[in-house]
């Protein structure tokens, strides 16, 4: 009888111990319900001097990212930290996620009874700052650690909303408010407003990665495209992960996935958890906004017929090529025809990564390619979207960049020492929202088109001849710009 009473008493106590945060969910819940959060496993010995850790996931993700093939939650427990894990909207912008996160941070703060340290991966770091600055969550948070967060957006989002890249992204269902908000022009506008309102700049600690794997790896697509923008982790450039006023602690040999791995990262940022944020070492950085053009890629995309043929030019002196053909089919591998008639069919196929999850990348690297007109041919058997990305390792890249920067709005054709002729064509699309675009009149100088408030995807096609007059070349520059309600243009104008 006494044993039964003890069991009943224990059950009642257990019920009430969970009741205070039962609304938050539990580890056994199906992950991915926006607004649900749960406490992590309790450490053997609680230490009230250690702030609770709140883990926030990124775009197209959920709280499961900290558990699935990841021991971050375990590392927190082993090191004596209480923790909480939250699910935000995987496909919503920083405004909506920031509001939701602010509400939940107050709940979590009330449960633990002391200030929190928020650890945000990727867009989760941006959502966290939105919660603090725009939705008054600062009182609940001691500091914020961001892991590979695109504080200035990512050119991969620009690519997904460009004329060439949007077809495939839309068919794959990747175009969302979340991806839309990460375009560099929109994030430039976000930074312009947010940085002025940030009252506690020393709360932020950033970490970044500079690895994106080897040829054919899961982050190879993003890394190859981003390399002309600088060091990157396969999804975000190092410069974008840094804030001018934050404690930008370290850039390490992590990619965008491994930077959230517990074994890799917890020992790295552990000493920052108890450090005074205002007194932490701060790395001096240059402005993340680079006005340089990335002139080492050629981009073409759209919707193909059953058979699709695209052509591009390789100039003399090119050291190497990286060719990627993205489509929905693992089997529909393209063939590449060199100017001398050689046919390449041994392309490697792998699953594509952000922002083209669900697609397949068929790719090949070519050393010392034959100069001239190259052709890539694909037979999908049906109408299907595709995206062609060609990266050039060429001495001409810097020359094109320098000459393109000189061209200004009034010049569409000019020459230099290594270039006989350089021409450009500008295509501009206006976005009313994350799903709909509206083409604007194409002109060589389209700055005067940027009048209406909203986002503008600008694609600049460069074509020309080298000094010999016999070798053609082509490049593509893509940027998203944002015009605010006062007519201010945010982002790098690529012409």
Segment roles from a protein language model:
Residues 2-9, 13-62, 79, 292, ...:
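Flexible, membrane-associating and regulatory peripheral segments of lipid-active enzymes
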Residues 25, 53-57, 83, 95-195, ...:
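Serine-dependent carboxylesterase/thioesterase catalytic core
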Residues 27-32, 39-114:
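Active-site catalytic motif of lipid deacylating hydrolases and related acyltransferases
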Residues 60-61, 90-91, 150-152, 211-213, ...:
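Short, solvent-exposed loop/turn segments at secondary-structure junctions
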Residues 65-84, 106-114, 119, 247-251, ...:
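Elongated, non-catalytic scaffold/linker segments and compositionally distinctive motifs
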Residues 68, 155-160, 216-221:
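Short aromatic-enriched loop/helix-cap "lid" or pocket-rim segments at secondary-structure transitions
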Residues 198-333, 377, 382, 403:
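C-terminal catalytic-base region of ester-bond hydrolases, centering on the histidine
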Residues 360-366, 371-374:
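Ligand-binding face of N-terminal immunoglobulin V-set domains in extracellular IgSF glycoproteins
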């Amino acid at each position: 009888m006494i044993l039964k009473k003890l069991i009943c008493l224990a059950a009642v106590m257990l019920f009430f111990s969970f009741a205070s945060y039962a609304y938050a969910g539990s580890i056994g819940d199906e992950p991915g319900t926006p607004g649900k959060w749960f406490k992590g496993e309790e450490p053997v010995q609680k230490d009230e001097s250690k702030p609770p850790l709140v883990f926030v996931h990124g775009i197209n993700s959920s709280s499961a990212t900290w558990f699935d093939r990841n021991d971050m939650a375990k590392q927190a427990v082993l090191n004596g930290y209480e923790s909480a894990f939250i699910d935000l909207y995987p496909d919503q912008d920083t405004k909506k996620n920031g509001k939701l996160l602010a509400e939940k941070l107050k709940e979590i703060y009330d449960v633990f009874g002391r200030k929190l340290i928020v650890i945000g991966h990727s867009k989760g770091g941006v959502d966290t700052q939105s919660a603090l600055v725009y939705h008054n969550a600062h009182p609940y948070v001691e500091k914020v650690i961001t892991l590979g967060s695109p504080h200035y957006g990512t050119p991969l989002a620009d690519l997904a909303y460009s004329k060439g890249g949007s077809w495939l992204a839309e068919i794959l269902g990747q175009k969302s408010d979340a991806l839309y908000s990460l375009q560099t022009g929109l994030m430039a506008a976000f930074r312009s407003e947010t940085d002025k309102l940030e009252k506690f700049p020393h709360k932020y600690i950033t970490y970044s990665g500079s690895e994106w794997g080897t040829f054919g790896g899961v982050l190879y697509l993003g890394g190859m495209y981003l390399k002309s923008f600088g060091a990157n982790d396969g999804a975000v450039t190092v410069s974008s992960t840094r804030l001018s006023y934050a404690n930008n602690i370290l850039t390490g040999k992590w990619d965008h996935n491994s930077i959230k791995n517990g074994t890799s990262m917890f020992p790295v940022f552990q000493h920052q958890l108890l450090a005074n944020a205002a007194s932490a070492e701060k790395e001096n950085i240059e402005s993340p906004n680079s006005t340089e053009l990335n002139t080492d890629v050629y981009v073409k995309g759209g919707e193909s017929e059953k058979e699709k043929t695209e052509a591009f030019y390789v100039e003399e002196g090119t050291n190497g090529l990286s060719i990627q053909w993205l489509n929905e089919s693992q089997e529909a591998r393209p063939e590449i025809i060199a100017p001398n008639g050689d046919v390449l069919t041994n392309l490697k196929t792998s699953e594509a990564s952000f922002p083209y999850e669900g697609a397949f990348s068929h790719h090949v690297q070519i050393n010392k390619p034959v100069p001239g007109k190259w052709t890539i041919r694909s037979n999908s058997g049906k109408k299907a979207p595709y995206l062609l990305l060609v990266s050039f390792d060429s001495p001409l890249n810097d020359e094109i960049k320098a000459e393109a920067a000189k061209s200004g709005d009034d010049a569409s054709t000019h020459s230099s020492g290594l270039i006989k002729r350089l021409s450009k064509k500008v295509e501009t699309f206006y976005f009313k929202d994350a799903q709909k675009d509206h083409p604007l009149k194409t002109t060589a100088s389209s700055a005067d088109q940027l009048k209406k408030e909203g986002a503008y995807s600008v694609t600049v096609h460069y074509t020309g001849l080298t000094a010999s007059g016999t070798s053609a070349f082509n490049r593509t520059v893509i940027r998203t710009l944002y015009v605010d309600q006062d007519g201010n243009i945010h982002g790098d104008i690529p012409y």
